[in-house]
Curated annotation (Swiss-Prot):
Similarity remark: Belongs to the CD164 family.
Domain of life: Eukaryota
Entry protein name: CD164 sialomucin-like 2 protein
Gene designation: Cd164l2
Region named Disordered: 108-132
Bilayer-crossing regions: 138-158
Positions on the Extracellular side per record topology: 30-137
Protein source organism: Mus musculus (Mouse)
Native organism taxonomy: Eukaryota, Metazoa, Chordata, Craniata, Vertebrata
Residues linked to a glycan: 69, 101
Length: 172
C-alpha cells in the first residue's frame, strides 16, 4: 500500500481540526456529557472537592447545581424548622427527611435573617454566579466567526505552501 499523499494528509488535518472545534463549541454551549457545561474545561467541575466537600455548599441551588458538582451532592431537610444542609448522596439519612436533587425542586427560602452579615476574613474564593442554561446567541456567532477565521487562515497557509512547492524545478 502506498503512503498517503499530501492531499490525504491535508484532508485528515482539516477533518481533525473541524472535529476539535465542534467539540469545543458543544462543550462551551453546554451540550457535552453530564457534568460538562459552560466553562467546564476551565473549572474542571471540582468545586465540592476543592472546597471541602458538599458541606461548604450552603444553598440548595448551589448544592444540586450540576455546574458546581457532578451531582454527588443532594440537599437534605429534616423538618420545616431546619434550614437544611448539603450532603453527599452516600450520607443521606432517609427517615423523616426531604431530599432534593434538582434546583427546581429546592424549597423556597422564607427565612430572612435579621442580623447583618459579618465581614469574612477567610480567603475563600467567591461562589460563581449561576447562568441560566439555554442558547447563547453571542457565543454561537463568536464560535462561527472563530471557526471561519481558522479555516480561512488554514486555507491561505496551505495555498502559500503549495505555491512554494511548485516553484522548484529539477536541473536534469
Amino acid at each position: 500500500m502506498a503512503a498517503p499523499g499530501p492531499r490525504a494528509l491535508r484532508a485528515a488535518l482539516c477533518g481533525g481540526c473541524c472535529c476539535l472545534l465542534l467539540c469545543a463549541q458543544l462543550v462551551l454551549a453546554g451540550k457535552g456529557a453530564r457534568g460538562f457545561g459552560r466553562g467546564a474545561l476551565l473549572r474542571l467541575n471540582v468545586w465540592p472537592t476543592t472546597q471541602g466537600g458538599c458541606k461548604h455548599l450552603g444553598h440548595c441551588e448551589h448544592c444540586v447545581d450540576r455546574a458546581h458538582n457532578f451531582s454527588i451532592c443532594v440537599w437534605q431537610q429534616c423538618g420545616p424548622e431546619e434550614p437544611g444542609h448539603c450532603v453527599a448522596q452516600a450520607e443521606v439519612v432517609k427517615e423523616g427527611c426531604s431530599i432534593y436533587n434538582h434546583s427546581e425542586s429546592c424549597p423556597a427560602s422564607h427565612h430572612h435573617s435579621t442580623e447583618e452579615p459579618k465581614p469574612s476574613t477567610t480567603g475563600s474564593p467567591p461562589i460563581p454566579e449561576d447562568h441560566s442554561p439555554g442558547f447563547d446567541g453571542a457565543s454561537f456567532i463568536g464560535g462561527i466567526v472563530l471557526v471561519l477565521s481558522l479555516q480561512a487562515t488554514a486555507f491561505f497557509v496551505l495555498r502559500f505552501l503549495k505555491a512554494k512547492d511548485s516553484t522548484y524545478q529539477t536541473l536534469i
